[in-house]
Amino acid sequence: MASEKGPSNKDYTLRRRIEPWEFEVFFDPQELRKEACLLYEIKWGASSKTWRSSGKNTTNHVEVNFLEKLTSEGRLGPSTCCSITWFLSWSPCWECSMAIREFLSQHPGVTLIIFVARLFQHMDRRNRQGLKDLVTSGVTVRVMSVSEYCYCWENFVNYPPGKAAQWPRYPPRWMLMYALELYCIILGLPPCLKISRRHQKQLTFFSLTPQYCHYKMIPPYILLATGLLQPSVPWR
């Protein structure tokens, strides 16, 4: 049964939570909003406590803002161990990917997991290579699924009383299409996902244009989930 209360007043992250409308407009997979939003959590060493907050683009991309802020606070030394999880409305561009890799090379005790709602300009070869290089360097990059949307709603959003279980339900197919394209990027395959926009009605359309290499390299369970492969029906 859902709680009739909103986030507890004792929650130390309450003042840093974003509003429900912000979460909906920033993290909707079909909404191609230009601005980016970052929800993040940090676990320091063996501590059981998790520090959560959020950030948005300024004159710099939100990823760079985070790295600069964390470095300037003085808590992070070359031997400091911490685990960082990002929930990004857009995946990092190639320049941010380079900055992230440079940061991690200077702080080998830091681990980073990145969940993204959308892929930023995924047709750009530099952005594709940047994401691939992140994964190669040990960063976990994944597309947000239903469980991540639920988690973010409960832990980062100032939801109204009685709305703890009422996070936005976006069609899983959009998430699967982005996940398929991310898989293509990691494997070094050509783009498979095409996104088009009709500006008059502000409608976003997703389509898949697979090639032979996609069918050859991508696991069947992913192709089945996105409808690119039909399940076999046994003969009787």
UniProtKB/Swiss-Prot annotation:
Q: Name the positions where Zn(2+) binds.
A: H61, C93, C96
Key word Zinc present: yes
List GO terms (cellular component aspect): cytoplasm; nucleus
**Co-factor note (free text):** Binds 1 Zn(2+) ion per subunit.
In which tissues does this protein get expressed? Expressed exclusively in the intestine.
Question: Under which main EC class is this enzyme filed?
Answer: hydrolase
| Family annotation (Pfam families) | APOBEC4_like
What does the record give as the active site? E63 (proton donor)
- Catalytic activity, as annotated: a cytidine in mRNA + H2O + H(+) = a uridine in mRNA + NH4(+); cytidine(6666) in apoB mRNA + H2O + H(+) = uridine(6666) in apoB mRNA + NH4(+)
Q: Which UniProt keywords apply?
A: Cytoplasm, Hydrolase, Metal-binding, mRNA processing, Nucleus, Zinc
- Give the cofactors, semicolon-separated: Zn(2+)
Q: What is its EC number?
A: 3.5.4.-, 3.5.4.36
Describe the effect of H61C. Answer: Retains most editing activity
Could you tell me the Gene Ontology terms of the biological process aspect for this record?
cytidine to uridine editing; mRNA processing; positive regulation of gene expression via chromosomal CpG island demethylation
Q: Which family does it belong to?
A: Belongs to the cytidine and deoxycytidylate deaminase family.
The entry's protein name is: C->U-editing enzyme APOBEC-1
What organism does the record attribute this protein to?
Oryctolagus cuniculus
The lineage is: Eukaryota, Metazoa, Chordata, Craniata, Vertebrata
In the UniProt record, what gene is named as encoding this protein? APOBEC1
